[in-house]
Regions:
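A detector of single, family-specific signature residues
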Residues: 1-142
Length: 142
């Protein structure tokens, strides 16, 4: 019967959706734990820790030394280019200045060459990919 088939398909999609959400929650927890080791305070930069822009910035600047080692203009450009939603140069500049202050005040437990810095970057990439896949699944259901 067609109704049973549709119901089955929807139920399986919802089940898979929940599995992906659970995986994302696990990744978010791991990312936050690692950030406390590699770049304490970075999570204060954005109101939404797991927005794509926040994840892009955290992926590029996984350690405060990476912020402090580049000049302000390069930092502003990285932030400006880290979202596809469009951001004003003024807002990018504001974020860059905030990020600099956070980096100066941050006391990480590991240095920039620690494996934890690389691990953090990989987990952020996994989370971004998972968010993208979930969006594709949701779009396919509509």
């Amino acid at each position: 019967n067609i109704h049973e088939l549709i119901f089955f398909e929807l139920r399986e999609r919802v089940r898979f959706h929940l599995e992906i959400e659970n995986e994302q929650n696990r990744l978010k927890f791991q990312i936050l734990e690692l950030l406390h080791q590699t770049f304490p305070g970075l999570e204060r930069l954005f109101s939404s820790r797991y927005s794509i822009i926040a994840l892009n910035i955290a992926e590029i600047f996984t350690h405060p030394d990476m912020v402090l080692d580049i000049d302000k203009e390069v930092l502003i450009t990285h932030i400006f280019n880290s979202t596809d939603k469009g951001m004003s140069m003024d807002k990018a500049t504001k974020y860059a200045l905030q990020l600099r202050v956070i980096a100066q005040e941050s006391y990480p437990n590991v240095d920039r060459h620690s494996f934890l810095v690389e691990k953090l970057r990989l987990l952020i990439q996994q989370l971004k990919q998972s968010i993208h896949h979930l969006k594709q699944l949701d779009d396919a259901m509509i």
